[in-house]
A protein has these predicted regions:
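Conserved nucleotide-binding and Mg2+-coordinating catalytic segments in signaling enzymes
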Residues: 281-293
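Juxtamembrane extracytoplasmic/periplasmic/luminal helical "stalk" adjacent to the first N-terminal
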Residues: 11-72
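Intrinsically disordered, low-complexity polar/acidic regions
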Residues: 68-232
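Amphipathic, soluble alpha-helical interaction motifs
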Residues: 63-66, 98, 283
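N-terminal membrane insertion elements
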Residues: 2-12, 16, 20-27, 214-274
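Signal-transmission coiled-coil "S-helix" linker that connects upstream sensory/regulatory modules
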Residues: 274, 278-281
Length: 293
């Protein structure tokens, strides 16, 4: 193979190798940066969601303290519940002896007065909360009074006149879905992320079920994990356009390939020019009649 062909070919191959290396390193760096940023967002907004749920739990704790100080009774329940309600709370409830007897607001929530232990959908997890002294969350489910919500049930234990502990019942708060997540999920959508919030199906299971998610399927997401009571929650995030910065990769590829082709062209031109120069030098020193150099 002639030198003027071989050398440009070698330059081209070396250039392609260099382009591949640059593209690979850039792609790796961009993915790492994207995952770092996504993890930061998942943690930030996952903590916000966690805090919203904890705020709901704190409402049940307030009721618990009132029950303790009131020896199992809460006077003016509606007034107290009204003052501790928040925008993401659908209702506040009391369930002495496992039966929901008081709900605020009462209007539209009459169907919520049920026997938790003997309810088909709520019985098993309510019994678990009672027997294991742990807060449980359940849902989202369609509420009998309309809409969707997540129930936070806090088992309450009081002491009788002999100092013996006994199970009083539950203080309950129903959190609106998706209202409770709206601030976090709206912000992530504006930043260009898809998301999914899931939790273990129940306290004794390792299987996760989706509580709320965006429209698209998540690909290789980062996550923020937290625990409520004895249940594990997971908030996952992924960029809506994927982890790769395809625009940047395309620009870099085109730029370096163009430089490679320019070097190949210049190399070939230089070799051809050098070859022609040598030919002219030989002709200049060669006798035109005899052909002797």
């Amino acid at each position: 193979m002639k030198k003027k062909t071989l050398v440009p070919l070698l330059v081209f191959l070396m250039g392609i190798c260099l382009v591949s290396l640059v593209v690979y390193n850039t792609d790796t760096h961009e993915k790492e940066q994207s995952r770092t940023t996504a993890q930061l967002n998942a943690t930030t907004y996952g903590e916000r969601i966690e805090n919203e749920i904890i705020n709901g739990i704190e409402i049940t704790d307030v009721l618990k303290q009132l029950l303790i100080s009131g020896t199992g009774e809460i006077n003016q329940f509606d007034t107290i519940a009204k003052n501790i309600m928040s925008d993401s709370v659908e209702s506040v409830q009391l369930a002495p002896a496992d039966i929901v007897t008081d709900i605020y607001p009462a209007d539209g929530n009459e169907a919520g007065k049920i026997d938790l232990i003997h309810d088909k959908e709520r019985g098993e997890i309510s019994i678990y909360a009672r027997d294991h002294h742990t807060i449980v969350t359940q849902g989202p489910f369609e509420l009998k009074q309309g809409g969707y919500g997540i129930a936070v049930r806090n088992p309450i234990y009081l002491k009788d006149e002999n100092g013996q502990e006994y199970f009083w019942g539950f203080t309950i708060v129903i959190l609106r879905v998706p209202d409770i997540f709206s601030d976090a999920t709206s912000a992530l959508s504006k930043f260009g992320y898809e998301y999914s919030l899931s939790k273990t199906d129940n306290p004794w299971s390792d299987n996760y079920k989706i509580i709320y998610q965006s429209d698209r399927q998540l690909t290789n997401p980062v996550s923020y994990d937290f625990t409520i009571g004895t249940e594990n929650w997971k908030f996952e995030v992924t960029p809506e356009n994927g982890w790769e910065n395809n625009t940047l990769i395309a620009v870099i590829s085109v730029f370096f390939i163009a430089i490679t082709m320019l070097l190949v062209t210049l190399t070939r031109m230089w070799l051809v020019s050098k070859e022609n120069k040598n030919k002219f030098q030989i002709l200049a020193h060669t006798d035109s009649l005899t052909g002797i150099y």
